[in-house]
């Protein structure tokens, strides 16, 4: 694909920004008025025709104007986008809203999804952190009821997981305390996934070399932690915002979008790709290769990881291809950074409960 000259680039940027604002095909007269280029009508039409031939514009059959393609938007967000930074008051308001006195991660992340959807006027999505890579701080057991033991696992980063384990024998409180002391001595500092693997390995080769107490402690802990980390939460807010956009006024299109939101595993897979990124990731859901649910075709996903050196999750905004990236990208960045700071300052020191 040949590179664009300054004239073509300026014309394309003008068309994209006009289309973002209006959702309507953009004609040569509107481009001439807003591009700042002093071109004759014939020269402007020729430039737009060249951009169409190059795959950056397309012309709906019912209109003389042009609309930008996904290729045009990719060039725009990669090379032409000039984000509009949030003011200090707006940044502080987001940080204050997230840092209200609330120790439950789920509540804070629901608040984050609400902030994303409210500021962007699109869908806001937040993926809760996976605790698999969080490091084991301590585990405690307590009798819960006849045939049940409560396990409370505390992880670095302030995450707390609880599980009720069904057992076939009675355990005294003193015995359960000894179990916890033994496990914490051997597994503190390991990630949850490493500890889970180590527990299985130790039980497989236990034989006669371990005391009965150690074997029973390992067996109980395996049942307590074997499924921890499997049920990550995906929070979605702002579905009704989509009805404000021309792309979703069709009932069938909106139904497809709602169906896509229900495809939790594919959404998580799509959003988790952001975890390896250092900054905002913008994904255009255009074809099967991107792995997005079918109902997101023609949508864009603006996402960023949060958490830093604590367990990491993802914040994102989902909307039509013609989203106002200059305004929304800074919002996603701000929420991501505010959550990261919050996790570092508060949750490393004070446990918070996951659902």
Curated annotation (Swiss-Prot):
MF GO annotations: DNA binding
Pfam families: HrcA (PF01628)
Keywords, comma-separated and alphabetical: Repressor, Stress response, Transcription, Transcription regulation
Gene Ontology BP term (one): negative regulation of DNA-templated transcription
Disulfide bonds: none
Keyword Transcription regulation set for record: yes
Biological function: Negative regulator of class I heat shock genes (grpE-dnaK-dnaJ and groELS operons). Prevents heat-shock induction of these operons.
Family matches, as PANTHER family: HEAT-INDUCIBLE TRANSCRIPTION REPRESSOR HRCA
Family: Belongs to the HrcA family.
Name listed for the protein in its UniProt record: Heat-inducible transcription repressor HrcA
Organism from which the protein derives: Nitratidesulfovibrio vulgaris (strain DSM 19637 / Miyazaki F)
């Amino acid at each position: 694909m040949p590179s664009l000259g300054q004239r073509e680039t300026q014309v394309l940027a003008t068309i994209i920004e006009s289309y973002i604002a209006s959702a309507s095909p953009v004609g040569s007269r509107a481009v001439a008025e807003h591009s700042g280029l002093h071109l004759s009508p014939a020269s402007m039409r020729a430039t737009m025709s060249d951009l169409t031939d190059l795959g950056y514009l397309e012309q709906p059959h019912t209109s003389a104007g042009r609309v930008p393609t996904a290729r045009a938007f990719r060039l725009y967000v990669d090379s032409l986008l000039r984000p509009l930074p949030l003011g200090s008051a707006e940044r502080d308001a987001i940080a204050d809203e997230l840092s209200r006195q609330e120790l439950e991660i789920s509540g804070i992340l629901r608040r984050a999804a609400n902030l994303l959807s409210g500021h962007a006027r699109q869908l806001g999505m937040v993926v809760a952190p996976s605790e698999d890579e969080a490091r084991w701080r301590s585990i405690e057991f307590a009798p819960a009821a006849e045939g049940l033991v409560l396990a409370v696992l505390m992880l670095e980063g302030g995450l707390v997981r609880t599980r009720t384990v069904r057992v076939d024998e009675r355990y005294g409180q003193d015995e359960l305390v000894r179990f916890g002391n033994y496990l914490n001595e051997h597994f503190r500092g390991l990630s949850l996934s490493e500890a889970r693997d180590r527990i299985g390995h130790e039980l497989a080769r236990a034989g006669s070399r371990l005391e009965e107490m150690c074997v029973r402690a390992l067996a109980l802990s395996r049942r307590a932690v074997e499924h921890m980390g499997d049920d990550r939460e995906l929070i979605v807010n702002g579905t009704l915002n989509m009805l404000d956009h021309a792309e979703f006024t069709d009932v069938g299109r909106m139904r497809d979008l709602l169906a896509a939101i229900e495809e939790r595993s594919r959404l998580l897979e799509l959003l988790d790709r952001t975890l390896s990124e250092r900054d905002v990731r913008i994904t255009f859901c255009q074809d099967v290769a991107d792995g997005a649910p079918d109902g997101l075709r023609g949508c864009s996903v603006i996402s960023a990881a949060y958490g830093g050196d604590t367990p990491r999750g993802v914040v994102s905004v989902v909307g039509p291809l013609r989203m106002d990236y200059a305004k929304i990208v800074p919002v996603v960045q701000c929420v991501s950074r505010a959550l990261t700071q919050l996790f570092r300052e508060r949750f490393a020191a004070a446990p918070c409960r996951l659902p």
